[in-house]
């Protein structure tokens, strides 16, 4: 699993050629992720392999609103996905139809991608905690896929009905977001 891997999975189910730029360790979890990606046709040839690293693990319990109530995770390896790593992949990224980013990446990497990718950048905020990283970056993002709580956080608008939902969307668009 993982947000990025799950998005890649769904893109492949739609028949879209998909590269997953991620970091994997040298543990059994890496083997599971690599095998599941191979089975789906997700290209991991540009993934960062971290010797002696632990592939990220995340267990999530959602609240009644669908946001994170409690989670246990080991996401340390995500810190290896630096702007330098993405700079080395920039030709691949800019040759794609779009780049999809999840907010598990370090903020500086998200900022790098939104600044240097010449194709549309789509972002999944992942959670309210991770969505905080996106403040100040939305003007360089094509499409945002927030849930209600993430949209409230990023727009500053409490969403209680259709009218406030539209107001939140307008506030996000006013920050430069395209969708």
Model-derived segments and spans:
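Short catalytic helix/loop segments, enriched in acidic residues and glycine
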Residues: 1-4
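Short, small-residue-enriched loops and turns at beta-alpha junctions
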Residues: 76-80, 107, 128-131, 153
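Structural motif
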Residues: 72, 98-100, 122, 145
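Short, well-ordered alpha-helical microsegments
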Residues: 30, 107-111, 130-134
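Conserved N-terminal subdomain of the carbohydrate kinase-like
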Residues: 13-97
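Short beta->alpha connector loops
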Residues: 26-27, 103-107, 125-129
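Conserved phosphate/ATP/ADP-binding segment of small-molecule kinases
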Residues: 116-121, 125-179
């Amino acid at each position: 699993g993982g947000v990025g891997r799950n998005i890649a999975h769904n893109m492949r189910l739609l028949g879209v050629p998909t590269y997953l730029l991620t970091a994997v360790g040298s543990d059994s979890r890496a083997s599971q992720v690599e095998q599941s990606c191979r089975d789906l046709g997700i290209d991991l040839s540009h993934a960062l392999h971290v010797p002696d690293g632990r592939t990220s693990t995340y267990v999530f319990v959602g609240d009644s609103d669908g946001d994170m109530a409690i989670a246990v995770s080991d996401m340390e390896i995500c810190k290896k996905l630096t702007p330098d790593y993405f700079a080395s992949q920039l030709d691949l990224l800019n040759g794609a139809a779009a780049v999809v980013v999840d907010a598990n990446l370090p903020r500086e990497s998200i900022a790098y991608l939104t600044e240097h990718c010449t194709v549309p950048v789509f972002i999944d905020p992942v959670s309210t905690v991770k969505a905080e990283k996106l403040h100040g970056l939305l003007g360089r993002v094509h499409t945002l896929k927030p849930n209600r709580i993430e949209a409230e956080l990023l727009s500053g608008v409490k969403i209680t009905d259709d009218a406030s939902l539209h107001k939140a969307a307008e506030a996000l668009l006013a920050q430069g977001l395209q969708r």
